[in-house]
UniProtKB/Swiss-Prot annotation:
Glycans are attached at N8. Its main location: membrane. The chain crosses the membrane at residues 51-71, 101-121, 145-165, 169-189, 206-226, 296-316, 368-388, 423-443, 474-494. This is Receptor for retinol uptake STRA6. It comes from Homo sapiens (Human). Broad expression. In adult eye expressed in sclera, retina, retinal pigment epithelium, and trabecular meshwork but not in choroid and iris. One of its GO terms (molecular function) is retinal binding. InterPro entries: STRA6-like. The modification Phosphotyrosine is found at Y643. GO terms for cellular component: plasma membrane; protein-containing complex. It is a multi-pass membrane protein. Residues 1-20 are annotated as: Disordered. Homodimer. Interacts with JAK2 and STAT5. Interacts (via extracellular domains) with RBP4. Interacts (via cytoplasmic domains) with RBP1.
Length: 667
C-alpha cells in the first residue's frame, strides 16, 4: 500500500516542470490577455485629449475676449467715445461681398467634429481630467446629457475661429492664425500618434477627420495670407470698401445687358447644343453678375460634407463585417444551412465556395447601392443650386412667392426668421436622412435583382422567381391580355375621327366591355397601385434632400416643412439683401459724401478719395465722367430709371393694387 503513493511522488525539482499552469500552452504568461486576431488595440496619446481641449477652450476664450476689445459698439453706446466692447459676429450671413471660403471651412470643421462626436465616449473631453475612475480602473465617460452639451461646446469652440475673419483688423488676423494653427496642430498630432482606433473601423477616425483637417489647413493658410496683405497695404480699409462691389456688378450687368436672343436662335441645333442646354439646367455653373447668397454656399458645403460622412459611415460599418464573415466561412456552414432545410450541394467544400460567392455578391450589391445613392444625391444638390438661382432672380424681378395669401407679406415675420436661421441645418439633416433611405431602397433592389435574376440565370440553380412565374403564368398572361385588348379596342373600336376631331363610337359595346372586364381591371389596379407605391417611394427618397421641391401636392405644399422653410428663407434673403437695394443705398452714401460739409464725415460714409470709384457704378464704356458731380447726377438719373423698372419685394406695400395681380406665381 505504501508503494502506490510512493510511485506518485515526484522530486522537488520536477514540480515546476509539471505544474498545473504549464498544461495550457495557449494561455498568456504573466496574466496578459490575448488580443483577438484582427482587432485593433486601444490607443492612448502621450497627452490626454482632455488636456488638449482644455488648452484649446482656454485659448478660444482668450481670443474671443481680445476680439471683443477690438470690436467697439458705438451704436449701442453713443455716449462713449471709443465705444464699449461687443461680441464679434462669427459670420455676416446677409453680406454679399464678405469672404465665403472662411465660413464654409469653419462650418465644415464644425460638422466633421460633430460627426466624430457621435461614436465618441467622451462628449466633453476636458471633463475626463476631473472624472473619478471607476472600480475597474477605467475612467467613466460622461454620457446622456453631456452629449447635448457637447454640441454646444464644439459650436462655441470654433466661434472665435470664424469671428477673426469678420473683425477686419490686423490683430484679428494674427489671432486667427494662432488659433487655426493650434487647432490644426492638435488634430495632426492626435492622428499621427493614433491613426488606428478600435471604434467602428480601425481607420474610421482618420478618414472621418479628413474634412476637418482640410478645413483647418485652409484656415491656417488663409489667415497668415491676410495678415501679410494687411502689413503690405495690399488690402483697402477693410470690408467697408467692399460692401457694394457685388451690388454694383449686379446692377451694371442688369442695365448693360446685351441682346443675346439673335445669336442664340442662329446657333445650330444638334446633339451637342441639346446636351449643353440640359447640362445648363441640371448642373450649376457660375454666371456673371449673380452670386448665390452665403447661406446657400454654406448649405452646399455642409451637404457635400454630410454626403461624405454618411457614406463613409455606411461603408466602413458594413463592408468590413461582410469581409470578415466571408473569410471565416468553413464547412460547418453546410450543417447550419441543413438545419433550415437548405441543401446547396452534397460536397461541403462546394457549399463553402457557394456561400462565399453569395457573400461577395451581397458586398457588391451594397457598394453599388451606396455609389448610386451618393451620385443621385450629388446630382440633386447640383440641380437644387440651379433652382435656387432661378428663384432668386425671379424674386429680384418682383415675382411673388407661391405661399398662402397669409404669408405673402414682404415684411420679415417670426416664422420667416426662424426658417432662415434653420435652413442650412435642415438641408444637412434632410440630405443625411435621404442618403440613408436611398441606400436601403437601392440595396434591397440590387440584392433582389442579383439573387433572384442574375445569379440564378448564370449558375442555373435556385430559379425561384422563374419557377413562380412558370406556375402563375396564366394569371399574368390574362392581366397582360386584358390591358392590351382594352388599349387596342379603345384605339380601333371605340374611337372614331370625324373632320379631324376624335369621337366615341360603339357605345353599347363599350359599356358591355367595361362591365365584363371590371373584375380583371380590379386585379390590374392592384398591380398598378403597388407600382404607384414603389414609384412614389423611390421618387420621394431621391428628392427628400431637395427643399426647393415640395413632396406634397400643390394645394398642400405649405404643409411640407422643408418647402415651407425654403420659401421663408427666400423671403428673408430677398428682403434683406437685395443687390439693387444695396446699390441704391451705396449711391445715396456716395452722393452724400460729395456734398460740401464743414464737419468731418461720419464713420459709415465713404472716404473723400473713394467717390470716383463709386461713380463708375452705372457708367457705360462709351460715356466716361470728366468730373465727380456730372457723374453723380448721371448715376442718380440712371438709378431712377432702374428703380422704376425693378420690382423690389421689400417695397411691395408701396405698389399699386393692379401690379400685385400681375405678378405670376413662382414655379
Amino acid at each position: 500500500m505504501s508503494s502506490q503513493p510512493a510511485g506518485n511522488q515526484t522530486s522537488p525539482g520536477a514540480t515546476e516542470d509539471y505544474s498545473y499552469g504549464s498544461w495550457y500552452i495557449d494561455e498568456p504568461q504573466g496574466g496578459e490577455e490575448l488580443q483577438p486576431e484582427g482587432e485593433v488595440p486601444s490607443c492612448h496619446t502621450s497627452i490626454p485629449p482632455g488636456l488638449y481641449h482644455a488648452c484649446l477652450a482656454s485659448l478660444s476664450i482668450l481670443v474671443l475676449l481680445l476680439l471683443a476689445m477690438l470690436v467697439r459698439r458705438r451704436q449701442l453706446w453713443p455716449d462713449c467715445v471709443r465705444g464699449r466692447p461687443g461680441l464679434p459676429s462669427p459670420v455676416d450671413f446677409l453680406a454679399g461681398d464678405r469672404p465665403r471660403a472662411v465660413p464654409a471651412a469653419v462650418f465644415m470643421v464644425l460638422l466633421s467634429s460633430l460627426c466624430l462626436l457621435l461614436p465618441d465616449e467622451d462628449a466633453l473631453p476636458f471633463l475626463t481630467l476631473a472624472s473619478a475612475p471607476s472600480q475597474d480602473g477605467k475612467t467613466e465617460a460622461p454620457r446622456g446629457a453631456w452629449k447635448i452639451l457637447g454640441l454646444f461646446y464644439y459650436a462655441a469652440l470654433y466661434y472665435p475661429l470664424a469671428a477673426c475673419a469678420t473683425a477686419g483688423h490686423t490683430a484679428a488676423h494674427l489671432l486667427g492664425s494662432t488659433l487655426s494653427w493650434a487647432h490644426l496642430g492638435v488634430q495632426v498630432w492626435q492622428r499621427a500618434e493614433c491613426p488606428q482606433v478600435p471604434k467602428i473601423y480601425k481607420y474610421y477616425s482618420l478618414l472621418a477627420s479628413l474634412p476637418l483637417l482640410l478645413g483647418l489647413g485652409f484656415l491656417s493658410l488663409w489667415y497668415p495670407v491676410q495678415l501679410v496683405r494687411s502689413f503690405s497695404r495690399r488690402t483697402g480699409a477693410g470690408s467697408k470698401g467692399l460692401q457694394s462691389s457685388y451690388s454694383e456688378e449686379y446692377l451694371r450687368n442688369l442695365l448693360c445687358r446685351k441682346k443675346l436672343g439673335s445669336s442664340y436662335h442662329t446657333s445650330k441645333h444638334g446633339f451637342l447644343s441639346w446636351a449643353r442646354v440640359c447640362l445648363r439646367h441640371c448642373i450649376y455653373t457660375p454666371q456673371p453678375g449673380f452670386h448665390l447668397p452665403l447661406k446657400l454656399v454654406l448649405s452646399a458645403t455642409l451637404t457635400g460634407t454630410a454626403i461624405y460622412q454618411v457614406a463613409l459611415l455606411l461603408l466602413v460599418g458594413v463592408v468590413p463585417t461582410i469581409q470578415k464573415v466571408r473569410a471565416g466561412v468553413t464547412t460547418d456552414v453546410s450543417y447550419l444551412l441543413a438545419g433550415f432545410g437548405i441543401v446547396l450541394s452534397e460536397d461541403k467544400q462546394e457549399v463553402v465556395e457557394l456561400v462565399k460567392h453569395h457573400l461577395w455578391a451581397l458586398e457588391v450589391c451594397y457598394i453599388s447601392a451606396l455609389v448610386l445613392s451618393c451620385l443621385l444625391t450629388f446630382l440633386v444638390l447640383m440641380r437644387s443650386l440651379v433652382t435656387h438661382r432661378t428663384n432668386l432672380r425671379a424674386l429680384h424681378r418682383g415675382a411673388a412667392l407661391d405661399l398662402s395669401p397669409l404669408h405673402r407679406s414682404p415684411h420679415p415675420s417670426r416664422q420667416a426668421i426662424f426658417c432662415w436661421m434653420s435652413f442650412s441645418a435642415y438641408q444637412t439633416a434632410f440630405i443625411c436622412l435621404g442618403l440613408l433611405v436611398q441606400q436601403i431602397i437601392f440595396f434591397l433592389g440590387t440584392t433582389a435583382l442579383a439573387f433572384l435574376v442574375l445569379m440564378p440565370v448564370l449558375h442555373g440553380r435556385n430559379l425561384l422567381l422563374f419557377r413562380s412565374l412558370e406556375s402563375s403564368w396564366p394569371f399574368w398572361l390574362t392581366l397582360a391580355l386584358a390591358v392590351i385588348l382594352q388599349n387596342m379596342a379603345a384605339h380601333w373600336v371605340f374611337l372614331e375621327t370625324h373632320d379631324g376631331h376624335p369621337q366615341l363610337t360603339n357605345r353599347r359595346v363599350l359599356y358591355a366591355a367595361t362591365f365584363l372586364l371590371f373584375p380583371l381591371n380590379v386585379l390590374v389596379g392592384a398591380m398598378v397601385a403597388t407600382w404607384r407605391v414603389l414609384l412614389s417611394a423611390l421618387y420621394n427618397a431621391i428628392h427628400l434632400g431637395q427643399m426647393d421641391l415640395s413632396l406634397l401636392p400643390p394645394r398642400a405644399a405649405t404643409l411640407d416643412p422643408g418647402y415651407y422653410t425654403y420659401r421663408n428663407f427666400l423671403k428673408i434673403e430677398v428682403s434683406q439683401s437685395h443687390p439693387a437695394m444695396t446699390a441704391f443705398c451705396s449711391l445715396l452714401l456716395q452722393a452724400q459724401s460729395l456734398l460740401p460739409r464743414t464737419m468731418a464725415a461720419p464713420q459709415d460714409s465713404l472716404r473723400p478719395g473713394e467717390e470716383d470709384e463709386g461713380m463708375q457704378l452705372l457708367q457705360t464704356k462709351d460715356s466716361m465722367a470728366k468730373g465727380a458731380r456730372p457723374g453723380a447726377s448721371r448715376g442718380r438719373a440712371r438709378w431712377g430709371l432702374a428703380y422704376t423698372l425693378l420690382h423690389n419685394p421689400t417695397l411691395q406695400v408701396f405698389r399699386k393694387t393692379a401690379l400685385l395681380g400681375a405678378n405670376g406665381a413662382q414655379p
